[in-house]
Amino acid sequence: MLDIKNPIEARKVIRKNEYRNQTAGTANKYVQGNLCILPSKYAMDFASFCQKNPKPCPLIGFGTKGDPSLKDLGDIDIRTDVPQYRIWEKGKIIDEPYDIKKYWNEDLTTFVLGCSMSFELPLIEAGIPIQHIENDTIVPMYRTSIDCEPAGQFSGKLVVSMRPLNSKDAIRSIQISSRFPAVHGAPIHLGDPSEIGIKDIMNPEYGDPPKAFKNNEIPVFWACGVTPQSVLQDSKPDFCITHAPGKMLITDKLNNDLAAL
Amino acid sequence: MLDIKNPIEARKVIRKNEYRNQTAGTANKYVQGNLCILPSKYAMDFASFCQKNPKPCPLIGFGTKGDPSLKDLGDIDIRTDVPQYRIWEKGKIIDEPYDIKKYWNEDLTTFVLGCSMSFELPLIEAGIPIQHIENDTIVPMYRTSIDCEPAGQFSGKLVVSMRPLNSKDAIRSIQISSRFPAVHGAPIHLGDPSEIGIKDIMNPEYGDPPKAFKNNEIPVFWACGVTPQSVLQDSKPDFCITHAPGKMLITDKLNNDLAAL
């Protein structure tokens, strides 16, 4: 873990390619974002897709065509400030570089989407144990049977993240995450996974499998920022760039600034 | 049902003993209250009990010793303004009169506690079906294994009301009822009834049994204003007066005035 509390300092290290790992826990009072960079011909459709699907795709940053800075989110150069990237061509990964200087061009537009880390800290601060954090694993994520609202060429299934919680913590987690509509907000489901098309809760499509459920634990499901990656895989644009899973953009925005109340 | 929207008009009818039935649906934008009237020697302990148990016993009105009015809640004479009362001696019901003029005395203090009707209307307005209202039955209520915080001679088990909801509505109902901490607030439990000591969900201790659960429905449990009646039954004060179940005090306070946000 990159143990730096200040987001500007953390980005400096990442910018120099001195840290190339996952960003969970780094500058943890600050918003981290999912990244998606697209050629201009796709930009309006993708913006529209985010607008129609605010729970999985909460847009917290929107660059100007050809401009690698994101002034709203801090002194950011998107070409260098993420630990690792993925370069996609027609839905396939062709490279996983540590900067994208050689891929950047004047036609690209940057999108930054909120991520659940922003409400996990308030959950932990409320005394709610988060299994995947305690085990230092990646949150289990599942492709559901729920269709996103399509926009232009972008369509696909909703991906959800899952946290096993007892009933009391499930209720409290609904209250707390409701305060953060800009980072997925309240859960979209709890209880029976098959109701949203999840066949095997122990076998997630993304992330690590959960531990066996305790008797009093129920699965609680939040819309997940991996949804756009899954949609990009399906929709197969000629070209796009995302962050590598878990290796997010660290911004200067406080998590608490995203709280609706 | 007493189909009057204005709480002052509704109380006038009740005051004249022209309506003696349950008050559900009457003046439904206004707060209705559970009633508890106690001799002064118990008043401080009961006030303390309410303070220690705000979820089941949210105190919304607190009279002055010997004074039957409740100016905070409207132009109320507590001796006449409830459709039917119960007179208790040592935990046993000895009378169920339509007014308490002959029982009132200078030593009595009135307590009014919030009730779940105040958040049921916002639930219905959010499109959430409430089974017991749709079936025109009384909400099922259960004595749990959860101890209230004792205060002086008052102690006993928490009573909960239960509404069967699908997962989506359960999540939404947690958000909506969280806005109303003064009337029980968020649920205290959902899912497995045995975790809170309920042996048979189809066999409630108070109110009417629920209908058979649909496949996608889970039981959602709120702290219930019947708790103080159950506690009074156990704690057996020499004398007390309550409302008869379902026949509540209608106040001039808007439900929306109780919303925390």
UniProtKB/Swiss-Prot annotation, chains A, B:
Keywords: Lyase. It holds the Pfam family D-Glu_cyclase. Its EC number is 4.2.1.-. SUPFAM superfamilies: PSTPO5379-like. One of its GO terms (molecular function) is lyase activity. Belongs to the D-glutamate cyclase family. HAMAP family: Hydro_lyase (MF_01830). This is Putative hydro-lyase SAR11_0660.
